[in-house]
Amino acid sequence: EHTVTSVDTPSEALAVSIGEHGRVDLPYMAELLGSPGDYERITTELQGVIFKDPSADADEPEAGWQTADEYLSGNVRNKLRMAQLAAESHPEFKINVEALTKAQPKDLEASEIDIRLGATWLNPAIVQQFMMETFQPPYRIRYNNLIQVRYSPFTSEWRIGNKSAAGMYDIMSTETYGTHRANAYKILEDTLNLRDCRIYDTIEEDGKERRVLNQKETMLAQQKQQAIKDTFAGWVWQDPQRRNLLVKQYNELFNSTRPREYDGSHIHFVGMNPVSYTHLTLPTTERV
């Protein structure tokens, strides 16, 4: 087995570097070209084929270089933000910004996004707004913020405080979106925590108490639960400002990744020493 000791072009040096080291190794590539330490020729000729990661050490010109297929994949939204920040003080990163801008995934529109109650990325303020607008609690509750939605990222649990504050005579809470056994706020809390609402009775048997499922009340409560889900599905996109905010947030969180793409086309390099390296391949993103 022969070892390549020299090449004629940066493109050939890149092919050997990837084949031998699995990465863009500028010192090794410069050695192959017979000009140790001369990285400028390589980076200039391979502009757009390799990219320097802005997070790499700026004092090490040979560090942090990646092939285009590697750099322009993964979380390209985060990478674009980093490149834009770097380009403000280092104009050489403008090429990164241009390439990453073209690599951004197409934004999903509201009609392509399904947001359900219980999604942990939802801002509790949005759920609070839905709850107030839909259940329409008495003025004293709204004015004093007596019933509040909270989410704990530590326990991944949603909580609605003071669920009984609306009272048993509040029609929206106990009839329209809830029952007398489980009011709307209790059902909403179950829904946020992805639980089916269940109603239990406590009975005494042989001197001991035990809980048994009340099927009739449970069925009624689950009908109200479905009504709340359906109402939210229609409500969430109604307000244009809220819609734009949620679409942007969803795309940032869940539509930021670009898969790494290999074309598979063969590039043949000739003139390298020894002859055994006359067939080397690179993705077309690395062709020059």
Task: Locate each region found by the language model.
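Pre-P-loop entry segment of helicase/translocase ATPase cores
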Residues: 238-277
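Conserved small/polar residues in nucleotide/adenosyl-binding loops
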Residues: 278-284
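Charged, low-complexity intrinsically disordered regions
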Residues: 1-249, 254
